[in-house]
């Protein structure tokens, strides 16, 4: 009865591992006991090296350090390495003038593979779902095994070794940072300072999924329609950000005695950021040996990029008062402006052609454990009661949200309007 319902001969012809005829050319390729997970995994070693030098005297202190780390991944051809260099110093130019300086550089390189649940591009996932009956490599006519990777099997599952050996998943990060803080103490109660910080970050990423040994991937548009098939894929991205920060401040402690302590801080902060990014994606290069974006099919290639700038500034004030070191009062006020705020922002203070947000707060505290009636309570070391009220805000908006009225969109994949 079953033979009437299903044609077994057709099934054998389509699934070679069901055919035990050793004279067939496909027998060796479909009668194996391959441990795919073992083939793509390996033992991994991690190395860490570091050098640190410290020195100085009563006038100047310095510290210099270099560190290097290299860690191999458990999947073949994956690894991570990082180099970091840092120098910082503390210099007393005079009894009143002090200068702090810090400079650092770090770079890292991560060679990785897709490790998610992806039946086309994840070597780990493919090694778990691919049948062990198939050979990872093709066989020559004389029956010897070649070095050429086997293609997609009859079940439509690709070769995970192709992703390990031929794909590219590279991420490179760079960071350079400088901090400087000169300060001058007029007295032991009055100090002024200016902190400057400059940070440069860059990220480069490269991705390539080969065609050899892997299934084609359908490309779907916004309507869910397949418009092409991807044999191989290239992705490149670059992002670069520069950040500058200034903070000019005054610290004043007009009252310091055993009963009263009053510390006042006021200043001005300025932040400036610039971000540049580029992204490109393409499909179907003429060969897996040509894995650059320019070699992809032009109709299946897309690029994008952006340049964004944003700034913010703040005038701030902070007052801390202590009475007998157990009754505490704190008052904070900040006036913030941002390039992301519209000039006519509702509820904002309009001044100097800018919209300012006012953010005050006040808090009071009582260190109960410092009271006389608490000294005999041994099981309690510290008890403090706090009450506070404040207003807060942020500039978590798109950089040009207050200026954009019209945006261009892609039409039918061929025009912008």
Annotated model-derived regions:
Residues 55-57, 91, 103, 182-184, ...:
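Residue-level signature of outer-membrane beta-barrel architecture
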Residues 50-54, 65, 88, 179-181, ...:
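Outer-membrane beta-barrel architecture
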Residues 66-72, 329-338:
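Transmembrane beta-strand segments that form the barrel wall of outer-membrane beta-barrel proteins
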Residues 40, 48-70, 74, 86-92, ...:
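Predominantly transmembrane beta-strands of Gram-negative outer membrane beta-barrel pores used
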Residues 347-360:
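Short turn/helix-capping motifs enriched in Asx and small/polar residues
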Residues 62, 315-334:
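Short, contiguous hydrophobic alpha-helices characteristic of membrane insertion segments
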